[in-house]
From Swiss-Prot:
Entry's family note: Belongs to the peptidase M28 family. M28E subfamily.
Protein name in the entry: Probable aminopeptidase YDR415C
Signal sequence segment: 1-18
Name of the top EC class for this enzyme: hydrolase
Keywords for this protein: Aminopeptidase, Hydrolase, Metal-binding, Protease, Signal, Zinc
Cofactor needs: Zn(2+)
Binding residue positions for Zn(2+) 1: 177, 196, 262
Enzyme Commission (EC) number: 3.4.11.-
Amino-acid positions noted as binding Zn(2+) 2 in the UniProt annotation, renumbered to this chain: 196, 235, 340
Domain of life assignment: Eukaryota
Alphabetical list of CDD domains matching this protein: M28_AAP
UniProt remark on cofactor binding: Binds 2 Zn(2+) ions per subunit.
UniProt key word Signal: yes
Length: 374
């Protein structure tokens, strides 16, 4: 008895010594693959290129994780053709690369936007204030800005909500993540995160600015609710978007479409400029609709590409039963090699390419804003 409890004590001491202050995290690294690791091991995995959902907060029954628990994503009949060409073209015309440059310069001037750092909180504060300024003339019964507090870390997610006029319960979401990371030493080294993923955030900010200027201010209002999400902590295992979509699923919200923008600015070969539309772990019917938008409104083509499991925040939508899609700067193999380092800087990006991504966002929210899900 005595020996046994000594033995237990010894083991506890060993574990405590090995992982001081490090509670285990539960990671889902594949559809049927779950592992438990200390916090510091998450970084090692990322450095080796492994992507995952950190589901620690959202699973109580592990390690007996059951895939059947994941809801299936319903298929909706998205519009087979576009019907708002004039309005969309009118907005696209006004895309301002100068404004995008200014926002990205400011956003990348934070030493890092690592979600656990004070800098990461400050960058969220700047983003929230800038969004409030962009949308300040829209009355509160139409537009609200929510600071989604994650409790475990300081950098909050931001949800901009344009409430629909006739079917506000049907929700269309545009997402991007605001955090950046230096995978070498995240708490110490710089991570300007221009492409990854400041570019997605700035692409969506510009779309929000034009949506405000050319649409809402002219008295238009979408039938469905349109939301812009700026997620915290993507780099920690999609933590921010998992919190948001898990809450939406619990509240039984009806998300009819989600489009993620993440890495929108790098062009490896200007002679062969295109966007990459991600076909794995996304929702086929929605992906087809996004292709229609690209064909209708962009001056460059798309190419199908694959990005792997838990690639970006759209994965948090689909694993909660909501349709998700993802358009990235190019075919995956041609994407920016400088991400997650001090070299992910603004001078390596193309604002014209980011503007093409902004067109996708405007096309999607204006077309789906007036679409009837039934
Ligand atoms: C708010 O936006 C206007 C342009 O619409 C700009 O001139 C002004 O500097 C902005 N203010 C802040 C605090 O960002
Ligand atoms: C969309 O809203 C407008 C008014 O804002 C209304 O006239 C129209 O019937 C609505 N469309 C649908 C499909 O509900």
């Amino acid at each position: 008895m005595r020996i046994q409890s000594l033995f237990v004590l010894f083991n506890v001491a060993i574990i405590a010594w090995s992982y001081p202050y490090e509670p285990l995290r539960v990671l889902q690294v594949g559809e049927n693959e779950v592992m438990e690791v200390p916090e510091s091991e998450k970084l090692n995995l990322r450095r080796r290129g492994v992507k995952f959902f950190d589901v620690t907060k959202h699973t109580s029954f592990l390690p007996f994780f059951n895939k059947e628990e994941e809801p299936t994503v319903p298929t909706y009949n998205y519009p087979p053709e576009i019907s708002n060409k004039e309005v969309v073209d009118d907005s696209i015309k006004n895309i301002d690369k100068g404004s995008m440059h200014k926002n990205l310069a400011k956003f990348t001037s934070f030493y890092t936007r690592y979600y656990k750092s004070d800098h990461g909180f400050e960058s969220a504060e700047w983003l929230a204030a800038t969004i409030a300024n962009i949308t300040k003339d829209i009355p509160q019964d139409t537009l609200t800005i929510e600071h989604f507090d994650h409790k475990e870390w300081k950098q909050y997610s931001i949800i901009v909500r344009v409430t629909g006029s006739t079917t506000p319960e049907d929700i269309i979401i545009i997402g991007s993540h605001q955090d950046s990371i230096n995978l070498l030493l995240p708490s110490i080294m710089a991570a300007p995160g221009a492409d990854d993923n400041g570019s997605g955030t700035v692409t969506n900010m510009e779309a929000l600015r034009l949506y405000t200027e050319n649409f809402l201010k002219r008295g238009f209002r979408p039938n469905n609710t349109v939301e812009f999400h700026f997620y915290s902590a993507e780099e920690g295992g999609l933590l921010g978007s998992l919190d948001v979509f898990t809450a939406y699923a619990k509240q039984k919200k009806h998300v009819r479409a989600m489009l993620q923008q993440d890495m929108t600015g790098y062009v490896s070969d200007p002679e062969d400029e295109h966007v990459g539309i991600v076909t794995d772990y996304t929702t086929p019917a929605l992906t087809d609709f996004i292709k229609l938008i690209i064909n209708s409104y962009l001056s460059i083509p798309y190419r199908d590409t694959q990005c792997g499991y838990a690639c970006s925040d759209h994965g948090s939508a689909t694993r909660n039963g909501f349709p998700g899609s993802f358009v990235i700067e190019s075919e995956f193999k041609k994407t920016n090699k400088y991400i997650h380092s001090t070299m992910d800087t603004l001078d390596r990006l193309s604002l014209a390419h980011m503007a093409e991504h902004t067109k996708i966002v405007l096309g999607v929210i204006i077309e789906l804003g007036s679409w009837s899900a039934w």
